[in-house]
């Protein structure tokens, strides 16, 4: 038997004045069919009342306790863009930004600069005292930064002022340790070096000539120490893979040793190539025991507060599922359909609202639920579960669980 966890990023919502959500209103023939043929429930990725990030939610869905394994977003971003991370490394997500001579931020995203590959080379490979700087752009104004060396700490503040017109924050230690003091000092020096190297760079000289915001500063945030995590294959004895369009989810997959399957046109946006992902899933099941697939467009629509686009994305995902269901057999595959968190239109951000979930496959206890949405699946046989329960349920269904007790 094989298993799939199909995650519709940002799936859940809150009812509007008419009691509808994008999922409830969408034409989801295949999702509803899966619900009718499976066992349904509702699920909080982390816990009841806890508003999940996509990173912590996916860790939980893979059976890892985020309270034990999550140190910050930085390590997963770094891993996702191809940096080889090691336990003890300190990692950050970064923006290329525009600042004046006083380090006042004039544009947090450097005019959404599209190509920073030449700027990356100015910073990658630097050494400050005994600390190596590993830096990689991750598309446009985004980048990842990793510090490698002895006696470093993640107990430091961010540099991000979060608003334009504010000065880049001095990084300070958050405890009294020498390690935190050293790390803050290294990072503050790095930001000064970055400004010196980037401000007069030919890329930025050309941008000034064209009256475009320069990318003359990096602003690190989301610090975390690279954690020690049991690889997925050792934890479960399954050869696993991940299909995702966003670097963060790819980073989580790489961190737990899932093979990342690259899909052309999979962008993580509402205009992503959804069907290419569906075909990739079917092909990947031929070579792997387990696949985590993340489809993100609904989340972006939720963050934008766009009800119609979120509904349309959900309908595109239903078309994906039609193809998938036509090409897998319930005798061979257990299929979990759910989300990682709700992104309500009214909030335009993640919320702690629970998500619909269904498990489809051989010998599941089919219940009376006939529609896949936030209001119907709560009547199903799974009742109310947490994300960390999904993998143990799958492992048991696959006949791989060990008995607890005599």
From Swiss-Prot:
Which gene holds the coding sequence for this protein?
apgM
Q: What is this protein called?
A: 2,3-bisphosphoglycerate-independent phosphoglycerate mutase
Entry-linked Pfam families: Metalloenzyme, PhosphMutase
Domain of life, per lineage: Archaea
Question: Which reaction does this chain catalyze?
Answer: (2R)-2-phosphoglycerate = (2R)-3-phosphoglycerate
GO process terms (BP):
glycolytic process
**Role played:** Catalyzes the interconversion of 2-phosphoglycerate and 3-phosphoglycerate.
Sorted keywords for this record are: Glycolysis, Isomerase
Q: What InterPro entries would the database entry show?
A: Alkaline_phosphatase_core_sf, ApgAM_prokaryotes, Metalloenzyme, Pglycerate_mutase_ApgM
What's this protein's family per the entry? Belongs to the BPG-independent phosphoglycerate mutase family. A-PGAM subfamily.
User: EC number(s) of the enzyme?
Assistant: 5.4.2.12
Establish whether keyword Isomerase is in the entry: yes
* Matching NCBIfam families: apgM (TIGR00306), PRK04024.1 (NF003104)
Identify a single GO molecular function assigned to this protein: phosphoglycerate mutase activity
Q: Which SUPFAM superfamilies match?
A: Alkaline phosphatase-like
